[in-house]
């Protein structure tokens, strides 16, 4: 990420066309989808095991999701995003272990099909979420990942705040409900 901005040849129209989805809009849409699914499932006469569990835990998950949406609106995210677009910060879009090749002490990132110009913390968030899901949300590992990342590219307070809000959002619950 340190070197992934101000790509030569990018013009303003390119940045606008390649801009990622505004996280405020994304969380609002996800929350709307969660409510829509809840309404649909609640109206069903016969619920399967997943649907019954969804209804049972929806209230607490909804509170968590709405809190993340509210916090994002109250932070400096808008300025963070504006800066990312002005600087032409490149996000991979799918920065997960499947797209990282390590050989001979060097790492190569592949598959940039979903790249965008956006807040680079989105990539770190996705990577951390995927790794931490597989490691039972080990907080020590999360701190170590942040420390290691910060040694290469120091994180500003507003970036850490944004990352924390993204990690707060019940993304896995939303994904399960939608698929």
Where are these regions (language model features)?
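ATP-dependent phospho-/nucleotidyl transfer catalytic cores
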Residues: 10-90
């Amino acid at each position: 990420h340190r070197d992934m901005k101000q790509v030569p040849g990018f013009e303003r129209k390119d940045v606008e066309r390649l801009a990622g989805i505004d996280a405020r809009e994304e969380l609002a849409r996800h929350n709307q989808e969660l409510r829509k699914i809840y309404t649909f499932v609640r109206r069903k006469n016969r619920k399967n095991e997943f649907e019954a569990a969804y209804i049972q835990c929806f209230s607490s998950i909804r509170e968590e999701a709405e809190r993340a949406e509210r916090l994002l609106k109250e932070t400096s995210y808008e300025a963070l995003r504006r800066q990312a677009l002005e600087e032409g910060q490149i996000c991979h879009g799918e920065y997960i272990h499947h797209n990282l090749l390590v050989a001979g002490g060097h790492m190569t990132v592949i598959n940039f099909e979903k790249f965008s110009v956006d807040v680079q913390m989105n990539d770190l968030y996705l990577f951390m979420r995927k790794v931490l899901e597989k490691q039972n949300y080990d907080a020590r590992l999360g701190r170590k990942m942040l420390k290691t990342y910060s040694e290469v590219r120091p994180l500003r307070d507003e970036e850490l705040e944004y990352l924390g809000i993204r990690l707060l959002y019940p993304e896995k619950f939303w994904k399960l409900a939608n698929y």
